[in-house]
Amino acid sequence: MKDFYKLYSVGKSTKKPYSRGKSFGYQVLGFGSGFSSAIAHRSVWGGAFQPSKSNVIDFVEIATAGNATDFGDLTVARFRNSSSAASSTRGIFFGGNSDPTRLNVIDYVTIATAGNATDFGDTSAVSQHGGAGNNDTRAVHALGDVSDSAVNTLEYVTIASTGNT
């Protein structure tokens, strides 16, 4: 299982054969920094550093321990802690790094149906290492690192519709 990371219920992954957490399963591809969107029954994450950027989106069914399954592809391969948010039906992925450039891309997926991400719109600036929070209607995105310096910019989108921040 050279290219797989083991998932643990404590929210960590490892290639080690032991851990303090209870085994959950394996990811389709290993990751260094990715992101996730979760609703009551499914966790979805995309992008990776394995050892390079990735456009792969994986998911697991939260109620059932087991290996991750390929969900689809992001519109742009990326890594470096893009941020994400989700409503009960849609997951959104903000920004990241496509090496050598930061991204302003926003992608979305319908969480209940596996498939490729679709372009949602753009953030106001290229960024990486951002953060996001949400309720079922709105996602708030903190830009994070813009041009090698942190910024204090918050932006939002309405999850059910597409468009720029």
What are these regions (language model features)?
Residues M1-T165:
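Polar, enzyme-active/binding microenvironments
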